Structure formats: structure tokens, C-alpha cells
């Protein structure tokens, strides 16, 4: 009879472990990875960029203190992915993120989103709601005591039931009131066995809200239970990503429209149409009057090169197109010769910028090393120099380049002149029509630049601006 009590004692020791065994069995059978829905851009933004050299925590710190959350990490990874692969984010040129503001209504957390910063020119492609799903709260096992006359004196446990389903509810709000309004959408979710981030496609909800002009939305993760009052970590706050295609991004001056926060020239500092070296005070005279327009973007006095070498002499005969006509030798009359002499005297007597000679020689020597013919020159733009670094997260600077140089006749093949530029250079060389300028050295092929910045509501925005960096130059 001695072994009987021992077996009962062993069973009573194992009984408290039954709920844990059941929970482990359910977790082992139902374990799944993070469900990032079917949005390829969102999934690749967080899971496909593990080869980044910069850790997510360090990258998120670029958004400022307290911003090391998932939305910051997600946007930075989307930016890094575009820089590496060059693929448009989500098939468009714009990604907007919207942070949530938490409010407690009827002892339940409700998240509010302000989507009013979306521009009218931005055509919504897809939208995703990203949220952290808490691990399920399994009901406790209830003990069922045996009756006093039962032969089996051991106690039994009632198997715990399944956790409650999670309901995701979206409502639109009126801008004049803070109450929840029209129901925009609802979906039932099964809580995962462990806490993880999930994403749900809410494109139809966002498009309908924008069509109705109601861009103040609320989202509620309802479990049917009251909130226990445990504060939610700031890193687990939900957010919305909207992938759009900005139809106005190719318009002139689009980069300044979206990135410039204030006028770089305050009132009184600059007048449109005024000469660059003019002064508001008529008594002040500047020693900076250039006699002729710098059509080739070169420094004044660059022609004073020690070794006289025209740009055409630097090219072989085969580098030019064959000429179907004879050499051009325009005949000048007395009036033209007299006018030319006057222009020469005026140019010689005019003054240039009043820099010291050492600085001018250094600048000229730098340009002497560069080809005189139209070509691409190096230019690095630092956003801090133009006052945009306060809201631009990345890049801090970029290689913009620029085009400079002469497009004189005959133009070599390397400058890739257009047909119009070729005809214009011939007419100028003949000299029959006075006042015809040289063709201009302008960008031919340009590259896009992805910029990650903060909008007026401190939400991270990724935009891909076209024609930001010069790749090749040509005469036009």
C-alpha cells in the first residue's frame, strides 16, 4: 500500500503543469512568422534589408530622441532599399508614414491618425496598417473537485478555452468634433501565439476616406475586454504607410515646393529681376560689372590661359563630323570691323569681380585643368548650406554635378549636339545674322534622388525626385 500515496503525490505535482503543457503544445503547432500581408514593399522594407551596414537602432536615431520605433526603422530601410536597388518604393515615388496618437475611450485604447498632409497630386496606390499584436491571454484552468464519495481522490482540471478573437475597427472623424463617426471598415483577426508585428491592407479604407474628405481616422484593436491599464511601449505604437505616386513631382520647382520651408531671401535682401551685383543704394557702386554674359559658365578672365590652345585643337579630325561644305570665312565690312574694335576696347576697360589675384589665379588654374569644351563638372550639394538640414533626414549631401564649357563651332562628337544646336552654331559662325549666341552646355541625362524628410507634422516621408544629379552633358 505504500506505493499508492506516492503515485498520488506524483500526480498532484504534475497537475499544475498541465496548463503550461497545453500552452506549449498550442504554440508549437500554431507558430508562424510575422505576417506582413501581401504588400511586397512593406515586407521587403523590414525583412529583406538585413544586409544593411547600419543597425536599425542607430538608423532610427537620425529621426531624433524618442523616435527609435518601428515606423522610423521601417522608413529608413525603405530609403536604404531604394538606394541599393533603385526600385520605386511600392511602385510609386512617394511613401508617407503617419504616427498614431493614443487616447483611452471607455477604458479601451483608441489610436487616432491625421492624414491631412497628403497632397492632392498624390495618387494613392496602396496603404497598410502596421500594428503589434499582443500575445493572447489564455483563460485560467478551473479546478473541478471530486465529490466526497468519489473513488478517485485526484482532482481534475477543466481544459482552458481558446483566446478571444481580435477585432480591428476603423472609423472616420469629423474635424470639428473628437467623437468617432462613420464606420470605415472592420476585420476579425486571430491573435498569434506570441507577440509580433503584422500588417493589414487598408487601401480601400484610405481611398474612400480621402474621396469623402475625411482624413482624420481612428483605429481600435478590440478584444472585448477592458484595458488592464498596462502602459503600451512607445515602440509598439501602430502606424500607417501610404504608397503613392505624386503626379506633380516632375513639374518645375517641385523639389522646392515640398522641401523648402521658408524663403531663403527675406524681404529686402533680394529683389527678383535685379542684377546679381546691383545695390539698392545708388551711391554704392560695385566693382563687379561683367562686360558680356558668361555663356559657358566659366570664370572671368579664363581666356588668359598661359598656353594658347583652342578646344578644337585638342581633338583629332576623326572626332568631328564630316563637313559637307567648305570652310567658313565670313567677310567683314568696315562697320563690323569698327564695331569689333569698340567691343574689344570696352571688354578691356571693363572690371571684373574684385577678388585678390591669388584667389583668381587658383580658381582659373582649377578650371584650366578641366576641358574647355562642354562637359560635366563636379558639384557637391550640402543641405546644411541651403538651410534644409533641419528636416531632411537623409541624405545630408549628394553629388549634383553641373554642366559647363564651350559649344563653339565646329562641335566635337563628345558634346552630342542636337540638330538645332548644330544649325545654330553654323549660323553664328557665318555671322550673317547678328546677335546669335552659342549653343548652351546643358544636362543631357540625369538621375533621380531619394530624399527622406519630415513633413510639417513631423511624419517621415520618402520621395524620389527626378532629375537631381547630372550624368551626361550636351550642347543644345
Curated annotation (Swiss-Prot):
Superkingdom of the organism of origin: Eukaryota
Knockout consequences: No visible phenotype.
GO cellular component terms, semicolon-separated: extracellular space
Glycosylation positions in this chain: 114, 152, 277, 467
Subunit details: Homodimer or heterodimer. Can form a non-covalent complex of the mature region and the pro-region.
Family label: Belongs to the TGF-beta family.
The protein's name in its UniProt record: Growth/differentiation factor 10
Source lineage: Eukaryota, Metazoa, Chordata, Craniata, Vertebrata
